Amino acid sequence: MGSLNLDLGKFRDIHKAARAFIMANGPSLNKMDLSYLDGEIVFGANAGFLIYKHYAWKHKYFFCVDARVVFDRLDDLFQLALDNPDTVLFLPRSVNVLHEDGLSTVRSVEEEIPKKLQNIVFFNMYPIGDPRVGAGLCKNLIRGVTEPFTVTATMIEFAVYMGFSEVYLIGADTNYQIDSSVKQSGSMGPEGVKSLLISTNDDPNHFDASYFGPGRKWHAPNTNRMIAHYERIKMLLPPQVRVCNAGIDSKLNAYERCNFESIFEK
């Protein structure tokens, strides 16, 4: 593992004073007219590409950092990059894979990608508090990318690094239901759910029922930690950057609210 993310240098301030839309994947997206995003710079993550069933536009930047999700969706992510050369896919070089006994091992993502593509960029990722990334929003991603409690935090971190001055969140519902049909294993988490999950039914927590549909592997969400990370980011934002929650049905109150469609009336 290299010590610096030199490949990220070319993205620093690449979108100085521009606006970006960060698409989290909550079911509230189904209540929004996302055709407005045609021609906009949109960040996406995980299985967010399922939105392409409904819209012609594509994400400009795409991310997956969760150790369980990245390997469960690795073929899909590679195909996304292969089919969409104008989309840049950002992935961690390696991740800590949590096992049922509570122990973890390091597994390389980079080595399991079928072949190198120009639009796949790998980075080193470190936990909050590591001196290479700091308290929750690293402003020099060459040093390291913050290991988040939600991939949406990673997207905000990259948006700040790229120089965007207006960052609009959509689909950040920050609300989950885990029913009895979900298979649980591993250690018990603070919200009363075990850490390692496998779905057996349709997914009620995202905009597409197949997102974490039958057989999909995921980690138990910890909304308290998610919100705490969002709040850390808010405190660390540069003064010239405005982050606004333009979604609906969202329990994320760390950022100011704004109306999605009114953004396009400017």
Regions found by a protein language model. Give the residues of each.
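Metal-ion/cofactor- or nucleotide/acyl-coenzyme-handling active-site neighborhoods
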Residues: 1-266
